[in-house]
From Swiss-Prot:
GO terms for biological process: mRNA processing; regulation of translation; RNA splicing. Residues 1-32 form a transit peptide. This is ATP-dependent RNA helicase mss116, mitochondrial. A motif (DEAD box) lies at residues 195-198. Belongs to the DEAD box helicase family. DDX18/HAS1 subfamily. ATP binds at residues 83-90. InterPro entries: DEAD/DEAH_box_helicase_dom, Helicase_ATP-bd, Helicase_C-like, P-loop_NTPase. It is found in: Mitochondrion matrix. ATP-dependent RNA helicase required for mitochondrial splicing of group I and II introns. Also required for efficient mitochondrial translation. The keyword Hydrolase applies. Pfam families: DEAD (PF00270), Helicase_C (PF00271). It catalyses: ATP + H2O = ADP + phosphate + H(+). Its EC number is 3.6.4.13.
Amino acid sequence: MKTGRTRPLRVFDILVPPWPPTVPHRIKLPRGKTNWFEFYSAITRNWNKLKGLKNCWQIWKDVQEIIRRIRKYQGESTVMQGPGNNDGAHPYATMAGKLDSKLLQALKVMEFEYMTPVQHRVLTELPSWRSDCLVQAKTGTGKTLAFLLPTLHCLLQGHSAPPRGQVAILIITPTRELAQQIAKSCDQLTSQLARPLECHIAVGGTARASALARFMKGAPSILVATPGRLKDYLSEPSTAEKLSNIQTLILDEADTMLESGFLADVKRILQLIPPKSTGWQGMCFSATVPPKVKDVVSVVLKPGYTSISTIEKNETPTHERVPQYHVLIPSVADTFTTLASLLNLEIKNSSKIIVFGVTANMVALFAAAFSQGLTPLKVFEIHSRLSQSARTKTTALFKEAATGIMFASDVIGRGMDFPNVDLVIQVGLPSNGEQYVHRVGRTARAGNDGRAIILLTEAESFFMKVNRHLPIQPHPQTDAINAGASSCADAVTKAMYSIGEETKQRAYSSYIGFFAGSGLLKQVRLDKPGLVQLANELAIQGMGCPEPPPMDKKVVGKMGLKGVPGFNYATGNDLNGDRPARPRGRPGNKTRDVLSPGAGQGDRRGSVSKNRGGRRGGGRGGRGGRGGKPRAA
């Protein structure tokens, strides 16, 4: 079978998901188009402007005609739907008489005609669908259906089904978003049953009391949970009783889950559920099998388990084949202007971008700023400070979007699959090299191309030395990016002016907390007063704050920074409300000397270097002038 370009047409990701990763030559193009790339470029270049084009109707008809031809081609050829497709077709229809008819009916409704490689191998290579197995497969290759189909089939066929109201299938996954995805797929697969099976979710970030009440009152057959909340459930005897007859335990994204700090929780869960000797089935899905996974596998899977891998032994990992670059920011105050300049440059070639920040509140500030017209692309925002419903909605919208920028924390850094992300930007230090790699893994998925860029200050550049094994090169247009930052300063100043004080204060506080609690101070060659000074520079020169945002003394104490000079301690209602504050000066340009460790403590001439307010109250400190009594420590 001949195939064309390997890059999918993004517009079709919305119109006919899942789009095959190869574009066949035998499908004729609309009139006037000589090749697939030309057609692809015309559509993606003008997609957001279709309403204003005179030929809008003709382009739409072209798209609809291509859809018709693609569907016809899929029906005639041996192309397999889904990622990793080049081995020939394995239609779900071949499972008739083996897989429950209602599940096959649901697959038809879901328009899943062909199995992906991992689905086909699990359904055909397991000695029994009740067998223990370790399956190596990447995210986005159809793993969810690979474990749901055999386990749901066994449950529907009544193989050792527990009493009604007790959980038969327990699925543990590392993030709330993945849990939502799995539960949605489960509901779709059971939608054709006369009485659909109840699938419940137990995740953090949601109202625990109401979720637990629904779980206890309902008749859950399937529970999808994150480790922390599941351990919480199992700690209560009445809740644990509902999990006393599990038939199948599934660990999804096991390497991600165990390498990201959940090892202790998972081990505790394995102690709280019925022992392996009771006969429950174990299924472990993981892209890699590091030592931590092997430790858990020995408990979850019995000796002689089936091992399946859909990953080529010599396949280059994503983080090694994605072009990666770094841009060194002149100073932390230039963070926002440099990011604006970089995005202005990159959106010429990238239309779906994820930008990671170091904390949830910094991400919120990025999103607020760039929503003020700093980019022509639609801005999305997702982080742990948002409600679960807001995060779920954003996840769905960004998946469907053809273009856009999503500012994100690590709630989507691991495991989440967003189609056609062609650029990942990381602003600031990742916690470690592993976190960096997982973020890079959000691009170049399912055979697509992608790039990754990290923005760091000079002090943070040690990250490249510590992680020499990562192929991070200097960005070829670093000089142009830094030069363009100054031209973005006015726009950034205007954007920052429209953002409330509380949003900036939270970002400022979280920035300090990140470094104070991460053990990175020594590596960036900072002491505690230096950290506060750096954060003040970011706030005043970068965020446009008139003075360091107010901090609560209790919060400062919890950060281990009690007595450190440079803080502007809150009084009265300083931490209440979210009022806009006019910035002083321009981001990236020094405006005042309030950045020293003695910030806010003017001398006799009104400067800021001493411990007493000046007579005339110059700067921010004079007792008799506008500064009043000094508030800094």
